[in-house]
Amino acid sequence: MEQIEQMAKEIERKFLVDQGLLPKKIIGEEYIQAYIAINDQGIVRIRIKGSIALLTIKTSEKGMTRNEFEYEVPLEDAKSLVELFNDKIIYKTRYKITIDKKLWEVDEFHKENKGLWLAEIELESENESFSLPEWIKKEVTGDQKCFNAYLSENPFKFWNNE
């Protein structure tokens, strides 16, 4: 039996975005994410971006570091899973912006989460320093409401003016 490698550590910080201050000519990619399992231990999701489909497992941990493991899966299988788990879906456009050699992933949410914009930056360590772009409003790292899994069950449109 093949030995499974240890899961990769994901260290990221998350922020609310003022979309009016974003660069004007950025190109995004459409994402569909269906959540297969969400519980206190973590999440299992299927993601479709273009012709690529990924099955992701993330553990639930406090702070900005989590375990993450990701597998590419056949696109048709992913589409079937999205249809099966169609009650917990996120639709978004992801824009990638590099600032000071660091990649920012900015998500514009659609449908039930329209109006919400979030940015993430992955870091090498929890203490790594980086520059905040002018379009960052507020840090929301660790705020469960800003996790995609939470948004799949509690859409932004139902939040009370937050």
Question: How would you name each of these model-derived features?
Answer:
Residues 1-162:
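Phosphate-end processing signature that detects enzymes handling 5′-triphosphorylated RNA
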